[in-house]
């Protein structure tokens, strides 16, 4: 069952419709409700390798839906510590729970100050109004 539209206050957002949950020098990354809704049902997740590096504003993987193949754009730079195997095995998990079980990767941030460039939920909602 698809998730209802929501944008949790505790997350930081990127204008490319990604989110970050920051805990110390680590961050969990995923795509927003808006992104999964626009894509439709996800059928494949091409994840980065654990130990690889992701860069802010650059692609770190792909998701394929019944509508399109889309790059995943990282909101932060860092080393991939963990890939959500549940999403690799069942990509539709992102549609069902984009902020919970549908997270994509966990990273150790290499440039913690980048988080200051991310958007609050209020700022992200303004991006959505212009979308």
Where is each model-derived feature located?
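Charged, amphipathic alpha-helical coiled-coil/dimerization segments
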Residues: 77, 81-82, 88-89, 95
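Short glycine-rich, polar/acidic loop-and-turn segments at beta strand-coil junctions
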Residues: 33-35, 65-67, 76
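Residue-level recognition of beta-strand microenvironments
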Residues: 20-22, 66, 83-86
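ATP/adenylate-binding site constellation spanning eukaryotic-like Ser/Thr protein kinases
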Residues: 74-77, 121
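Charged, well-structured alpha/beta interaction segments
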Residues: 55-71
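Acidic, low-complexity mobile loops and tails
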Residues: 1-59, 92, 96-131
């Amino acid at each position: 069952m698809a998730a209802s539209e929501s944008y949790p206050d505790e997350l930081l957002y990127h204008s490319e419709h990604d989110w970050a949950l920051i805990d110390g020098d680590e961050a969990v990354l995923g795509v927003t409700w808006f992104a999964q809704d626009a894509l439709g049902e996800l059928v494949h997740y091409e994840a980065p390798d654990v130990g690889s590096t992701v860069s802010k504003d650059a692609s770190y993987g792909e998701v394929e839906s019944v509508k399109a193949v889309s790059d995943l754009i990282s909101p932060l730079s860092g080393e991939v510590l963990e890939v959500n195997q549940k999403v690799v095995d069942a990509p539709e998990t992102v549609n069902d729970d984009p902020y919970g079980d549908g997270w994509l990767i966990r990273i150790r941030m290499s440039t913690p100050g980048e988080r200051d460039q991310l958007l609050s939920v209020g700022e992200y909602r303004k991006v959505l109004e212009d979308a």
